[in-house]
């Protein structure tokens, strides 16, 4: 499982120019599931995201978690995160998990985050989406589980 965590001031996702998910301060999560991922990886990723301290405290140190700043989450499924570009010029996506299991695990991931007390907005699994955001920092982390 690979999750790109982007610290944002705001973010939204639209489908056919209609906004389907929108947050203020928080995390934009781009989520890629790979073959072999199970609920164990989903829970581990959700736990890490809930606890990671990448917001600045009053002294300017990255010492605060998403919960500490009352942040929100926008979760977007993105299988292209698992692209293999080592050979040739055309990315291979053989490592990316296929639906319906990938959809179920992405939904499980979002539920895990909600169960931890976060407000979670989402894109639509498998849809062609337009994601817009205002990075805060920028501060971007790639989480591989």
UniProtKB/Swiss-Prot annotation:
Pfam families with a match to the protein in the record: Tyr_Deacylase
Comment text on domains: A Gly-cisPro motif from one monomer fits into the active site of the other monomer to allow specific chiral rejection of L-amino acids.
Gene, per the UniProt record: dtd
Chief location category: cytoplasm
Catalyzed chemical reaction(s): glycyl-tRNA(Ala) + H2O = tRNA(Ala) + glycine + H(+); a D-aminoacyl-tRNA + H2O = a tRNA + a D-alpha-amino acid + H(+)
Family membership noted in the UniProt record: Belongs to the DTD family.
EC number: 3.1.1.96
Group of enzyme by EC: hydrolase
Subunit structure: Homodimer.
Record keyword Hydrolase present: yes
Function: An aminoacyl-tRNA editing enzyme that deacylates mischarged D-aminoacyl-tRNAs. Also deacylates mischarged glycyl-tRNA(Ala), protecting cells against glycine mischarging by AlaRS. Acts via tRNA-based rather than protein-based catalysis; rejects L-amino acids rather than detecting D-amino acids in the active site. By recycling D-aminoacyl-tRNA to D-amino acids and free tRNA molecules, this enzyme counteracts the toxicity associated with the formation of D-aminoacyl-tRNA entities in vivo and helps enforce protein L-homochirality.
GO molecular function per UniProt: D-tyrosyl-tRNA(Tyr) deacylase activity; Gly-tRNA(Ala) deacylase activity; Ser(Gly)-tRNA(Ala) hydrolase activity; tRNA binding
UniProt-annotated location(s): Cytoplasm
Listed name of the protein: D-aminoacyl-tRNA deacylase
Keywords for this protein: Cytoplasm, Hydrolase, RNA-binding, tRNA-binding
GO cellular component assignments: cytoplasm
NCBIfam families (UniProt xref): D-aminoacyl-tRNA deacylase
């Amino acid at each position: 499982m690979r999750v790109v965590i982007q610290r944002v001031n705001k973010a939204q996702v639209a489908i056919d120019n209609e906004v389907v998910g929108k947050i203020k301060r928080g995390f934009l999560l781009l989520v890629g599931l790979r073959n072999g991922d199970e609920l164990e990886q989903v829970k581990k990723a959700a736990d890490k995201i809930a606890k990671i301290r990448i917001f600045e405290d009053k002294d300017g140190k990255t010492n605060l978690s998403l919960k500490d700043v009352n942040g929100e989450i926008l979760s977007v499924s993105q299988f292209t995160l698992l692209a293999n570009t080592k050979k040739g010029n055309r990315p291979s996506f053989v490592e990316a998990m296929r639906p319906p299991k990938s959809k179920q695990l992405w939904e499980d991931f979002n539920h895990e985050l909600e169960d931890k007390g976060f407000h979670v907005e989402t894109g639509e699994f498998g849809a062609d989406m337009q994601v817009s955001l205002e990075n805060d920092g920028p501060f971007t982390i790639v989480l591989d589980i």
